[in-house]
Amino acid sequence: MEFYKGVLYESTGQYGESKLRALDYKNDAILNNVNLSKSYFGEGLTVLNDKIYQLTWKEGRGLIYDVNTFETLGSFNYGQSKEGWGLCNDGRQLYKTDGSENIWILNAETLEEERFVQAYTNKGRLTNLNELEWVEGKIYANRYQKNGVAIINPINGAIEAVLDFKDLKNKVTNHPGLDVLNGMAYNPDTKTLFVTGKRWDKLFEVRIIPAN
């Protein structure tokens, strides 16, 4: 998920069910919607310069759309990263995860993977990096099958803090298909983080207060 000019953009997954949607989060209205080919499993997205970049999981390809019309503008192939998981941008370049500890840095013009940084704590590497969000100069990343979000220095990959969202799962309706946290979007207008998960029936708005 990602906010762009006040609109919330969402990529959903599963083969045969993947979508790209634009939402008015205040009333849950769908402003635009496109279904992906049944051969694609939709993953992370980011919006830069009025273009939406959407990853697919194992297909080795990213999709490009016009942010206003959802017209398909093209696609790009992955390089050394073999899968598509999470995506964000800092206004100049794109950051991409592939399920490992690597955060790949893509040239915004050519979409080539130019280099990568690795996410590490003082105890070792942090693997299974998934959804990404650019927040005030830091990369927020959740880990696959975890309910926490790591705050990562984009220059050197150092984990500077971890946000624990496990209690949010207790606030959603319990059902057999309920899964873990898997979606977040930072709203720069309100400076709040919107958090949800796979098959959650709620979208939480969270304000992050730095520890003294």
For each feature predicted by the language model, list its residue ranges.
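Blade-loop segments of beta-propeller domains
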Residues: 27-64, 70-81
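A short beta-strand motif characteristic of beta-propeller blades
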Residues: 29-36, 71-77, 113-124, 161-163, ...
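Loop/turn-rich, solvent-exposed surfaces of beta-rich toroidal or solenoidal domains
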Residues: 124-158
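Short loop/turn segments that connect beta-strands within beta-propeller blades
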Residues: 23-28, 66-70, 107-111, 153-157, ...
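Beta-rich, blade/repeat-based domains predominating
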Residues: 1-5, 38-48, 79-91, 123-135, ...
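Beta-propeller domains
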Residues: 9-34, 204
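Conserved beta-strand positions in repeat-built beta-propeller and related beta-rich domains
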Residues: 10-14, 52-59, 96-100, 141-145, ...
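Hydrophobic, well-structured mid-protein blocks that either form specific transmembrane helices
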Residues: 62-122
